[in-house]
Amino acid sequence: MSERKFFGTDGIRGKVGSGQMTPELALKLGWAAGRVLSRSGTKKVIIGKDTRISGYMFESALEAGLSAAGLNVMLMGPMPTPAVAYLTRTFRAEAGVVISASHNPYYDNGIKFFSTDGSKLDDNLELEIEAELEKPLECVESHLLGKVSRIEDARGRYIEYCKGNFPADQTLTGLKIVVDCAHGATYHIAPAVFRELGAEVIAIGDKPNGVNINDKVGATSMAKICETVLTEGADLGIALDGDGDRIMMVNSRGEVIDGDQILYILACDAKARGVLRGGVVGTLMSNLGLDLALQALDIPFARSKVGDRYVMELLKELDWRIGGENSGHILNLDHGTTGDGIVAGILVLAAMRRQNATLEQLTAPMEMLPQVLVNVRFEGEHDPLSSDKVKAAQAQVESELGARGRVLLRKSGTEPLIRVMVEGDDHNTVLAHANLIADAVKSAS
């Protein structure tokens, strides 16, 4: 496969106004994508965005480029990423476009595409779009220009879709839930979903102003929701990220429930109902406690590279349905084509209702093992991981940890860093082991 110049593993992303994230590139990208997508299908594209102030600028640029290529554009306004995937499917659009940088600060933004079935755009189509980007922009004749319309009921459609994932014979009546929307795309969606299902909802992070997305709130900043759950005496908390494709939860004691624990809940519930197909896909960073807890239930577990794209690839390869990352990207292919924080939360709440259990009770059988991550900077072209000294240190630690421990060494994809991760039963022991390997890496670099 050819090297991609613009598209990364999750579309195009960067600081607004520099590099690739400029209005000029967005316009040209819209045109190039339009040229590729107009070769077949409905010639209809949906655009959604999160709440960043730059979203308006990029939306206008993409809209102009797509129209210049002859495609009709349907605007959703601020909507979660999984909502774009869902409505792309239901409108039979040729593609969906999301303008978002997910959990990044407001001064970053990104553009990614969904195919007509709501899945990430095929690599080959991305390469075709990149090839068109190299060509001069040529507008279609005036009578062939695309038209632009707005999906006025996008919010209501997606709210009903989310609620449809909860058992029809159950409600959330009696539950007090704190919902943190990260001042992002779910601010006008998530609180309504859980309220309409019967819960008492305390919403935080629900007042976006264009520059406060993910600012000390949301799934990557859990302190505020943990505090709010305790002060409000809530049963649990649900924290979403800026574009709504990631979830973290909080139990009534104010303790964080991460993506690994959510996967455990969903797998146990699916097995109890006899609907678990195969096993569960995690990543190289998934806690060993998840692996061991699933083993105890005879549920297979497989690890992919880090990134929800790779989780999806392995799910499809194994023909399994449930997978995700400890960071909160949760995939359940029986309930959607992409990570969806609101739907994942609904599925956990459904498990609680079916089993008449609290979040604490559902996670109790899974023991999260202490995990230490040490980053070691190195210089030069030499790969420290090929050093005999590093290999010997790793072998020594793995031998001492045995079956209830794990070592992972990997290079950062963006910086000259070696990431040393060690898991085991005792935090102090794990920390000592991680430092032992880190020292070996330093001496080898």
UniProtKB/Swiss-Prot annotation:
Positions of disulphide bridges: none
Residues with Phosphoserine modification: 102
GO cellular component: cytosol
Active site residues per record: 102 (phosphoserine intermediate)
Cofactor note: Binds 1 Mg(2+) ion per subunit.
Catalytic reactions on record: alpha-D-glucosamine 1-phosphate = D-glucosamine 6-phosphate
Enzyme nomenclature, EC number: 5.4.2.10
Identification of the protein by name: Phosphoglucosamine mutase
Name of encoding gene: glmM
